[in-house]
Structure formats: C-alpha cells, structure tokens
C-alpha cells in the first residue's frame, strides 16, 4: 500500500513538472510570437520613417524652389514698380514741359498778334494771312488830307525784285518800311505756325523782306 502511494505522489510531481514545462513552452512561444510581431512592426515603422524622410526631403526641395520663385517674383514686381514709378515721373516731367511749351507758344502767339495789330495800325497795312507764306498780299492805306490812297500789293514771297520795288515805293510815301517789313515777317510766321503740316515747296526760299536793301536802286519789273 505504501508503494502505491509513493508512486502516485511521484506521478503527480512528474505531471506537475510536465504541465509546467508545457506552460513555459507555451509562454516562450507566445513571447517569441510577440517579439516577431514587434520586430515586424518595428521594421514597418522604420520603412515608414524612411519614406517619410524622403517625402520630407522632396517637400523641402519644393518649398525651397517655391521660395526662390517667390523671391524672384517679388524682385521682379519691385523692379516693375520702380520702372512704373520712373515712367510716371518722366510722364509728369514731359507733361509739364509740354504745358510750358504750349504756354510759351500761346505767349509768343499773343505777342505776335499784338505786334501785328500795332504794326498794322502804325503802317496802315492789312496783310492777307491766308495767302502767306507763298504770297505777300494785302493793301496799305495812305491817309491824306482830302482822301485816303489805297496801295494794294500781291507778290510771290520769293519775288525779291518786286518786294524791293514795293518797299522803295512805300519808302517814297514816307511809310516806315522797317515796320512794314516786320509786319509781313510776323504775319508770315503766324501763317506758317497755323499750317505747319503743309508748307509750300518754296517756303524755304521765303526770306524775311527785312533783308531788302533800301539803298539799292529800284529794279522795275
């Protein structure tokens, strides 16, 4: 009976040791499985980190490229703004110059018109400015005690001999020929300013008749 009891106790210990061994092997297998899964997950994480770093590098390159493009664009816009401002300033200066030029032209025109009026009244001469600069056409009124004498004239501006003869005649009638010549010159200037686009072919030959020498002998046409 004692032997049976001892064997039973031994079997129990053997069984307990076997069960414990099985449990340890099961735990070891579970740990190995968990370690493998962890290593697999760690490898996936490492690969994900590598891909992430690559994506970050690509993104950084794109950001740098966009930044450089933006800096170039900003620089271009600044240069363009400076050029626009410089153009505005040039236009302002040009407009002011044009304004001053127009003012001087108006002033000169008013001075000429006033001089023409004064000389016309002083010499009693009316100049047909529509005929200028090709022709010197008009009439001089010689005031007398009993009646006025009209001295009409119609000559080509290039007819130096005819103009010389006319000036000699006016001079003989005590008309201030220098004033008469100045009147014709100013009237010619006004006419050429009024029709600058279509000058006559011989306009360059229309010299001021102020150059006529009154001391030279009269040449009859």
UniProtKB/Swiss-Prot annotation:
Belongs to the SPC25 family. GO terms for biological process: cell division; meiotic metaphase chromosome alignment; meiotic spindle organization; mitotic metaphase chromosome alignment. One of its GO terms (cellular component) is nucleus. It is found in: Nucleus; Chromosome, Centromere, Kinetochore. It comes from the Eukaryota. It comes from Drosophila eugracilis. Acts as a component of the essential kinetochore-associated Ndc80 complex, which is required for chromosome segregation and spindle checkpoint activity during meiosis and mitosis. Required for kinetochore integrity and the organization of stable microtubule binding sites in the outer plate of the kinetochore. Participates in SAC signaling that responds specifically to disruptions in spindle microtubule dynamics. The NDC80 complex synergistically enhances the affinity of the SKA1 complex for microtubules and may allow the NDC80 complex to track depolymerizing microtubules. Component of the Ndc80 complex, which is composed of Ndc80, Nuf2 and Spc25. Disulfide bonds: none annotated. The keyword Plastid does not apply. Keywords: Cell cycle, Cell division, Centromere, Chromosome, Coiled coil, Kinetochore, Meiosis, Mitosis, Nucleus. Residues 63-114 form a coiled coil. This is Kinetochore protein Spc25. Its main location: nucleus. The keyword Cell cycle applies.
